[in-house]
Regions:
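Conserved NB-ARC/NACHT P-loop NTPase core of NLR-like innate immune receptors
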Residues: 1-305, 312
Length: 312
């Protein structure tokens, strides 16, 4: 960055070329051993074109530039990603592994759940009266079964049950409450979390505008459009913490030009957006993107007109 301080403003390909390919050119000779680069959640990276561009570049680092790199890429098998891997350039240098039940994910999920609940108990001294280990093994068995091999299900449960300001036993009871109308256990979990949303603000509106505007570093834009007070969005999103990523800094704050500012967290998993966009799955929590795009346009023009009038 000292040699090229404007690098962060360049295209992704220029950045990758500079930071990876050009960097290896300074090494002579090249290392004899290969280095492993792990890329998880490729399907959640920006947009389809970007994802395919990343795969093309990674392929060229091996086939064209002959760099001593190996990649472990984790992704949902979206059609455009499968198409990229089916192209000859990638097909001949890759190996595919389907993470199905043969890998026994339930065993790892069980360990994850037991460890997560143990940490919740250690953090909440009020739970010391409960018989340990808490919860009982039968509940762990049920949660492992419901997870269907999906770690996101188990991770969301641990975040939901262990959320601050809530009673873990009550939160767990909500998770265990059956919903015969849910299409899947993950959908049921998402619906349950949104159903107990603690704020009086319309949760669907908040989610709809966050997805539509897509400006994580400008929460005040969403606050203006929703008519919120400054800082209110941060408070509102705390009620959705189990569905959001944990930021590097506490409460999603970041240092921006020497000033601590709030950054809207990303959703923890792409499956949550899939749930919101499908009305048959999310029901009353359905987010109609076209509707919110129209609302953003109308409300933005309204705010602009209000600002113009205030200048007169």
């Amino acid at each position: 960055m000292e040699l090229n301080p404007t690098l962060h403003t360049k295209s992704m390909i220029v950045q990758l070329q500079t930071l990876i390919v050009d960097a290896f050119r300074y090494l002579s000779p090249l290392p004899q051993r290969s280095y492993l680069v792990i890329i998880d959640g490729l399907d959640e990276c920006h947009d389809k074109a970007t994802q395919q561009l990343i795969l093309q570049f990674l392929c060229e680092t091996i086939t064209v530039h002959k760099l001593p790199l190996r990649y472990l890429i984790g992704s949902r098998p979206e059609s455009h990603i499968r198409d990229s891997f089916d192209q000859e350039s990638l097909y001949t240098v890759t190996r595919r592994v389907v993470l199905d039940e043969t890998f026994d994910p339930g065993r790892d999920i069980r360990v994850f759940l037991r460890d997560g609940f143990a940490k919740i108990c250690a953090k909440n001294t009020v739970l010391s009266h409960l018989e340990q280990p808490w919860p009982e093994e039968g509940i762990i068995d049920l949660l492992v079964q419901r997870s269907s091999g999906q770690f996101i299900y188990a991770a969301t449960i641990i975040k939901f049950v262990g959320a601050d300001l809530y009673s873990p036993p009550i939160q767990l009871a909500l998770v265990l409450k059956p919903d015969p109308t849910a299409l899947s256990d993950l959908d049921q979990l998402y619906t349950q979390i949104l159903s107990v949303y603690p704020s009086s603000v319309n949760v669907v509106q908040v989610l709809g505008f966050i997805i539509t505007i897509d400006t994580r570093r400008l929460p005040e834009v969403i606050e203006d459009i929703l008519g919120m007070e400054e800082g209110e969005l941060k408070s509102v999103l705390r009620g959705l913490s189990s569905l959001m990523e944990d930021e590097n800094d506490k409460d999603g704050e970041c240092l921006n030009k020497g000033v601590i500012s709030y950054v809207i967290p990303n959703f923890a998993h792409a499956s949550f957006c899939d749930y919101l966009f499908n009305s048959s799955r999310s029901g009353p929590f359905h987010v109609n993107l076209q509707e919110y795009e129209n609302q953003v346009t109308i409300r933005s023009f309204t705010l602009i007109m209000q600002s113009i009038r205030s200048w007169r």
